[in-house]
Each structure stands twice: as C-alpha cells, then as structure tokens.
Amino acid sequence: MARTRASKSLVDRVYEYLLDQIITGAIRYGDTISIKGMAGRLSVSSMPVREALKRLEFEGVVDIKPRSSCTVRVPSRRTILEVYALREALEVYALSCCGGRFPRASLARMEGIVARMRALGKEQDPVEKEKKAIALDREFHGEICALAGNDLLNATYRQLTLRVNMTLMHEKTFHTMEEDWAKMHADVLSCLQKDPVRAVGLLRSHFAGATEIWKKNGGTARA
C-alpha cells in the first residue's frame, strides 16, 4: 500500500508540473510532449508521466498518440469565448460574495501587482515584458477569484486557465491594450477600494474590451 500511495503521489506531482507548464505558457497549445523526454526531464520513470497525461486527456487538454507522445490541444474559437465568459462570471461572483467589503490583505497584494504592472513600462525587452505581463495578469485575476474564499471556485478557475491560458489571450490583445493595460487594472482596484458597486461594471467592461480586441486581432477561426 505504501508503494501505491507513493506512486500516486508521484503521478500527482507530475500532473501538477504539467498543469503549471501549460497554464504559464511554457508548454504551448499544439506542442508535442514526449513521454520519454518528460520522464527524463523530471528524473522519473515513464509510468507517472503516462498516467498524468491520461488525466489531462480525460480533461480534454491533450491527445495521446502512439509512439509515446501526445499533443496539447489547440482550443477552438468557441472554447476560448466560452472560457472567457466563464472567467468573467466567476470573478463577478467572487466580488458579490464580499458584499462590498474586501480583505485589506487582498487589496494590498493587488496594489503590489498593479505597482509591478506600472513598473513594467520601463522594461526594454519586449519578450520579457510580455512574459511578465502575462504572469501579473494571472496574479491579479487570481486574487479577484480568491476574494470569494471558495476552494472549488479557485479550482474551477485554474481549470479554465488550463484550457485557455493568459498567454493565448495576450498574443492577440496585449500589443493593442499595452498603453492602457496597467491603468485598466488600477481602475478596477480603485473601485474595489472606493466604489465596490461600480467595480462589477468595470470588470465586465474590462472583459468585454479584451474579447473584442481578441476578435479584431485575428482570434483563432476554428469553430
């Protein structure tokens, strides 16, 4: 039994690693994952990698192919729009759970995130700038979801960002929104601090604007 529990724990760790790699964009949609190569990278046998990938296949994230490899599914246009709509719904729900009173610690963390967003304007390397912007965007919206204090909501949100990560959205939106990007997030935070009722409308507007820019800038045409 001890060996079974240890093996299961190893599968969980490999699964979490793969999740993190996809969510952060280190593994991109359409990439091929070699089971043998991943096992070598993580210094484990092929078995836990294979089992972790089976879980991701069941969740609709990858397609396992013969010859010990799999491909990360490229989300369709419909999936992207559905995920974005659900993300908006979850964040709006999270705000409604607080009744207009938000934890100071949460607001302080969001202030720190916004400060780093503003400082990012000084970054000269465009690749590094976008990489950091994606991470900060993910942090900010994750903090909004965390306001609900609902573990299931947070887990659902994470699954949504697995299906459609911030990297995919930023590829079609960041360069258009770049000048106002930090300000948009700062405005949402300001409303949370001073005008909670208006915060919901501003958050919806933020999602609507990003969605329209994504569509105009050539969001994937797959149905």
Q: At which residue positions do the language-model features occur?
A:
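Amphipathic alpha-helical dimerization/coiled-coil segments
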Residues: 90-121
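Hydrophobic, amphipathic alpha-helical faces that serve as interaction scaffolds
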Residues: 86-102, 138-175, 213-214
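Hydrophobic side-chain positions on well-ordered alpha-helices
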Residues: 21, 26, 120, 124, ...
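Amphipathic coiled-coil alpha-helices
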Residues: 90, 113-116, 120, 129-132, ...
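Short linear motifs at protein or domain termini
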Residues: 1-100, 211, 215-223
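C-terminal all-alpha effector/ligand-binding and dimerization domain
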Residues: 118, 169-223
